[in-house]
Swiss-Prot record:
Reported cofactor(s): Zn(2+)
Underlying gene: cpsA1
InterPro entries: Amidohydrolase (IPR017439), Bact_exopeptidase_dim_dom (IPR036264), Peptidase_M20 (IPR002933), Peptidase_M20_dimer (IPR011650), Thermostable_CP (IPR053493)
Species per Swiss-Prot/TrEMBL record: Saccharolobus solfataricus (strain ATCC 35092 / DSM 1617 / JCM 11322 / P2) (Sulfolobus solfataricus)
The protein's name: Thermostable carboxypeptidase 1
Active site: 302, 373
Binding of Zn(2+), residues: 104, 109, 245
Length: 393
């Protein structure tokens, strides 16, 4: 029996076990940096499987498992993120979230379950492994600021790693389909804040004020013009203003207005140009109307997620032995898995969960997001298959 058939047979034995783990985590979701029960479940499960476990790697809720092979070889890292989102779940699932205002709306519950399933398969087939398989259960991917990957890396989780792989469940692809690409696959997210300082006054006499709301509207229109006017329209790039705050009463023109939003890009030159254009636009428009301004960008954001071309080519061939594989366009979401890929070559890929018959049609981060659980065994199988193959390179 070849490797693929052996692992397929083994994963059938634990399909229900993987689903039950996922449901338990889904019922009790935990926000970034607070994944206490989730990380406890992970550590306990790994120990029961006979996996060497280290807790608190870089962050209190981080867990790392190590499976050592029967002979020398490569070190392969597999990663799953664990945190949930501040979303009130709006589904009829029997195992829907029991935590008010918190939901696994991005599928990280499935990521944990699939990697635990992969751990089971790898322990059972330890004789096929060379080197070391490192299982990274990461907190705080959804933080969007520091994120959980950076402190784990600083604590040494990637030391000696030769290859690294990660899976993300996605409703953008049909159930059971793997999707990835060579090179940039996810964007850098530059969060920004623009503050316009004007001069307030009575709503009946706007000519006596420097109206920060009016000025903010001019800035917003001009900023949206950066796309396809200053930046090549064939480049994957977007600017979105997502919050505008100003004022307290209908007859008062306020002193200040604040806007926040995000820039998403895959290319460092495009990113730099966009930020420069934004600063110039804000400064110029505020100057015209006599206002002052501040433009702030979040520091140390997630880098662009860049798949190694050679490794990804091989990954696509390997995954095609267990399901359909498609080459996807870049996604303008962001991921701190990008930090792991800066330390070792590897591949980040999606596993489709869209299934109209089961009502799994809502996007990630939706309050109605649901997952076709039939795909979870595929994720576990993919983890194990890639680990065995690349540990023996």
């Amino acid at each position: 029996m070849d490797l693929v058939e052996k692992l397929k047979n083994d994963v059938r034995e634990i399909e229900d076990w993987i689903i039950q783990i996922r449901r338990k985590i889904h019922e009790y979701p935990e926000l970034s940096y607070k994944e206490y029960n989730t990380s406890k479940l992970v550590a306990e499960t790994l120990r029961k499987l006979g996996v060497e476990v280290e807790e608190g790697v870089g962050l209190p809720t981080a867990v790392v498992g190590k499976i050592r092979g029967s002979k020398p070889g490569k070190t392969v890292a597999l990663r799953a993120d664990m945190d949930a989102l501040p979303v009130e779940e709006n589904t009829d699932l029997e195992f829907k979230s029991k935590v008010k205002g918190v939901m696994h709306a991005c599928g990280h519950d499935t990521h944990v379950a699939m990697l635990l399933g992969g751990a089971y398969l790898l322990v059972k087939n330890k004789d096929l492994i060379s080197g070391e398989i490192r299982l990274i259960f990461q907190p705080a991917e959804e933080d969007g600021g520091l994120g959980g990957a950076k402190p784990m890396i600083e604590a040494g989780v990637m030391n000696g790693v030769d290859y690294v792989f990660g899976i993300h469940i996605s409703s953008s692809y049909p159930s059971g389909v793997f999707a990835t690409r060579k090179g940039p696959i996810m964007a850098t997210p530059d969060a920004f804040k623009i503050i316009v300082h004007g001069k307030g006054g009575h709503g009946s006499a706007p000519h006596e004020t420097i109206d920060p709301i009016f000025i903010s509207l001019q800035i917003a229109n001009a900023i949206y013009g950066i796309t396809a006017r200053q930046i090549d329209p064939v480049q994957p790039f977007i600017i979105s203003i997502t919050t505008i705050h100003s004022g307290t009463k209908d007859n008062i023109i306020p002193d200040d207005a604040e806007m926040q939003g995000t820039i998403r890009s895959l290319d460092e030159n495009v990113r730099s140009k966009a930020k420069d254009y934004m600063r110039r636009i804000v400064s110029s428009i505020c100057g015209i109307y006599g206002a002052t301004c501040e433009v702030k960008f979040m520091e140390d954001v997630y880098p662009t997620t860049v798949n190694n071309p050679e490794v990804t080519d091989e990954v696509m061939k390997i995954l095609s032995s267990i399901s359909t594989v498609v080459e996807t366009e870049p996604v303008l979401g962001a991921e701190d898995f990008s930090r792991f890929l800066q330390k070792a070559p590897g591949t980040y890929f999606f596993l489709g969960t869209r299934n109209e018959k089961k009502g799994c049609i809502y996007p990630n981060h939706s309050s109605k997001f649901c997952v076709d659980e039939d795909v979870l065994k595929l994720g576990a199988l993919a983890h194990a298959l890639l680990a065995v193959k690349f540990s023996n390179k």
